[in-house]
């Protein structure tokens, strides 16, 4: 799971002002994202049959590139189209209920603080998304930025749980994020609003891979 979190692209139609979401996602897939989440929220978000139809089209794209397709906070849609997994927040469906309904799917959980981490049923989730790293405009209900604090604190007590950082992340922050113990980054605007999506995605993937290699080298020296 940790390798799958290297470059996690989160996107919905409201995040794509320059191009159609299908074009955006396909370009990101071509350029090296490792996981995709369909997060369809906002005032102009698709609903009902339109949302289902879009999810199916995005799922087909992800299958073509062998990238897992995750749906945000809509377990019924996950079940309906047999998506690869579900991502939920602290105030969404309880994770034990999600696992009961999706025994063989990927389940991710958002965590912001150590208090949230400590109260979460981590035994039934496959990864946690920690953030927001920086203040972000992509989520209207975003919590205060936590930087690397929570990631570092979690890694001190849990070396095994897969962690992805999210929230206002650009390539400038990748090194510090990986050094703090994250296994990858999740981005929205850094890809969806980029002038050149392929170039932006490749740069992010390059920075993540470089940071992971450097971290492993330091770990090997310490051993």
UniProtKB/Swiss-Prot annotation:
One of its GO terms (biological process) is thiamine diphosphate biosynthetic process. It comes from Streptococcus agalactiae serotype III (strain NEM316). 4-amino-2-methyl-5-(diphosphooxymethyl)pyrimidine binds at residues 37-41, 72, 110, 139. Pathway: Cofactor biosynthesis; thiamine diphosphate biosynthesis; thiamine phosphate from 4-amino-2-methyl-5-diphosphomethylpyrimidine and 4-methyl-5-(2-phosphoethyl)-thiazole: step 1/1. This is Thiamine-phosphate synthase. GO terms for cellular component: cytoplasm. Binds 1 Mg(2+) ion per subunit. Keywords: Magnesium, Metal-binding, Thiamine biosynthesis, Transferase. Condenses 4-methyl-5-(beta-hydroxyethyl)thiazole monophosphate (THZ-P) and 2-methyl-4-amino-5-hydroxymethyl pyrimidine pyrophosphate (HMP-PP) to form thiamine monophosphate (TMP). Belongs to the thiamine-phosphate synthase family. Its cofactor is Mg(2+). One of its GO terms (molecular function) is magnesium ion binding. Coiled coil: none annotated. Mg(2+) binds at residues 73, 92. 2-[(2R,5Z)-2-carboxy-4-methylthiazol-5(2H)-ylidene]ethyl phosphate binds at residues 136-138, 168, 188-189. It holds the Pfam family TMP-TENI. It catalyses: 2-[(2R,5Z)-2-carboxy-4-methylthiazol-5(2H)-ylidene]ethyl phosphate + 4-amino-2-methyl-5-(diphosphooxymethyl)pyrimidine + 2 H(+) = thiamine phosphate + CO2 + diphosphate; 2-(2-carboxy-4-methylthiazol-5-yl)ethyl phosphate + 4-amino-2-methyl-5-(diphosphooxymethyl)pyrimidine + 2 H(+) = thiamine phosphate + CO2 + diphosphate; 4-methyl-5-(2-phosphooxyethyl)-thiazole + 4-amino-2-methyl-5-(diphosphooxymethyl)pyrimidine + H(+) = thiamine phosphate + diphosphate. InterPro entries: Aldolase_TIM (IPR013785), ThiamineP_synth_sf (IPR036206), ThiamineP_synth_TenI (IPR022998), TMP_synthase (IPR034291). Its EC number is 2.5.1.3.
